[in-house]
Structure formats: structure tokens, C-alpha cells
Amino acid sequence: MAAKIVITGASGRLGRVVGEGLAAGARSLLLTDIADPPQPLPRGAEFRRIDLTDKAAMLALAPETAAVVHFGALPAERSFEEILGPNVIGTYHAFELARLAGARMIFASSNHVIGFHERGTLLDEDSVMRPDGFYGLSKCYGELMGRLYWDKHGVESLSIRIGSARPEPRDVRQLRTWISHDDLVRLVEAGLAAEGLGCRVAWGISGNTRRWWRDNGAESLGYKPQDDAERYADALDPAEPGSGPVALRYQGGGFCAEGYSRDEPSPADIFAWMKDR
């Protein structure tokens, strides 16, 4: 049985991007999702309908798994109960699959693991986690699971803290957080090819002029982004419309504001922050 790269969440927005990109490099792919298969199916790829929370179905893939590219998740803020199944239990099953297969894991983490850091703060991969919601919290869990599985079982993993993966940035925040689809595929490819990967974290961003994050982890993999959000800057509204003071204060933007119940920062604090922008 030929070993394949298993992509979870392969029918999702970014799962399709990564599947198409890896297929273009003549990779042998096994695509999985609870949803219908992506159309058209990438050339040479096989699809199986699998629920991430079905442990037996996930682990049954081990004999034919060369690597796991785990993009399956609820991709937005939801209640804890909704997040728990796909994002927490499902991620555990994906790491168990990698362990049983003796395969490496590429984990789709998120910038929302650090969302409550203030804007203007330059972060690196070792900056403290400050998730901005249950979605971000679930990605913290996935990154820490990568650490556990490396230390305890020797499972290599790359956690990619994906910024804003879109065809082009949609607002001025994304001038800092954007990663093009092509660069996302390049970063996944770098993680699959790297020798001595161990357990690493990398920021999933393009070569943006206005970046908030120092991407030493990705550079050490040989990742060379080809795109920069700055080319879109003149077309974007500099006011970041629709964002209140909480969203504008923190790197996570609107995720920080959703469900926020503390007293909002005082006007003095807001003005101090604006002065330092």
C-alpha cells in the first residue's frame, strides 16, 4: 500500500488550496473531510469522507500515511462546545494518526493563539500565548500537543500560525497578517521537506513589509515567501472600518472584541496606544 500525505479538512477553504498546491508538485494525496469532496478533485488524489471525531476511522489510515497535514477544524470563533469536537478531540486523533504511522505532522495553527498581544508589539515564536477566544485556545492546545508528541513519542511537527490566508488582504490589519495562497503552499512544502524538523512553530505570513511577527522559525526551514501585502496598501481604507477600540488595540482584531465583557480600555489608555503606533 503506497504511503500518502493525508490532508484533513481537505474540502475547506484552505484545505482545497493546500491540496491543489501539493498535487501540482506530484504528491500522492489522501484527502479527508466530513463534507463533500473538493471539486474538481486534484489530479491523482483520493478522497474519503471521515469525521475527525471518529477515532477508529482516523487511526485506520495509519498504514497508508506518509505525513499528516491537519487543516480540519471549525475555522472561526464558536462556543466551547462546538469547538471541542473538531478542534480539540479531532486534533488529538490527528496526532495519534501521525504517531501510529511514524509520520510528521503539519498543523494549521492560527495567529489567534496570540491575539491579545497589543498591536505594535513585535513577536517571535516564543512569545507567550494569549489566545483571543475558544478558537485560538484550541490552536494553543494543538501546538502544545505537538510539543507533547515530540517530547514523548518523537513525532515531528510544524505548527503554522496562519495569519490571513486570502487571495489578497481585505483591510489594513491584513497588511501585517496576510499570507498569499502560493506562500501558504510553499510553507507547507518546506515543513514536509525539512530535515531534522523536530517540533517547530512558524508564523504563516508572506514577506509583508508591515509584519508584526519575526518569522525565524519559517526562515530556518528554508521558506522563502514571494509575496508582500504592501502591493495592496493603496487600495485599502486606512481607518479599518467597523472596528471598535478593543479590536483596534489588539493583534487579534475582531476576535478579541467578540464576547468581550471587561470594561473597555480607558480613553487615556487608548490615546497612549495611538501615540505609539
Model-derived segments and spans:
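Conserved C-terminal active-site "lid" loop/helix of NAD(P)H-dependent oxidoreductases
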Residues: 38, 207-224, 239-272
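Glycine-rich NAD(P)-binding loop of the Rossmann-fold in SDR/ketoreductase-type enzymes
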Residues: 53, 82-93, 129, 137-140, ...
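Catalytic helix-loop patch of NAD(P)-dependent Rossmann-fold dehydrogenases
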Residues: 85, 118-157
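Conserved Rossmann-fold NAD(P)-dependent oxidoreductase catalytic core, especially the SDR/UDP-sugar
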Residues: 93-130
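Alpha-helical substrate-binding/gating segment
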Residues: 161-168, 178-199, 207
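NAD(P)-cofactor binding segment of oxidoreductase domains
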Residues: 68, 80-105
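NAD(P)H-binding glycine-rich loop region in Rossmannoid oxidoreductase-like domains
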Residues: 50-86
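N-terminal Rossmann NAD(P)H-binding glycine-rich loop of SDR-like oxidoreductase domains
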Residues: 5-24
